[in-house]
């Protein structure tokens, strides 16, 4: 038995091979023709991971590229939108290149809004998307404040105060009594 590796073939192509056997006195072409077809390149296979750490304006999501389709992954990341089935024409956060797991930080999101997100991967054959996930950012609400009873009461003054239990998701801009 013998074998030879043929390099530089084109994907998704049919090839025909005939073998030649030779020794130092003669050579003989084998009449039998073998046929084979090379595997076609495909777009990558990518899965969208679960969305985590959702706040009023941020979230973390990513994906896993499980198959590169026979070619180098040149870009990967997530696409997101407030409408279903986001594509690269919507919001995009890139996370480098290559096969494997990755994460992306989504920032500057609107509070109390539902977003749809999908992981994506790009190779020379094209772009593929993972399954769609959705999440809703936390809504900004009115702060929750408690007031304490007045202390140190005199004829002309008293000490009063309170505690902010929940800022409602927004940065405190003012406080007072």
Task: Mark where each language-model region is.
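Short, surface-exposed linear motifs at loops/turns and structural transition points
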Residues: 1-177
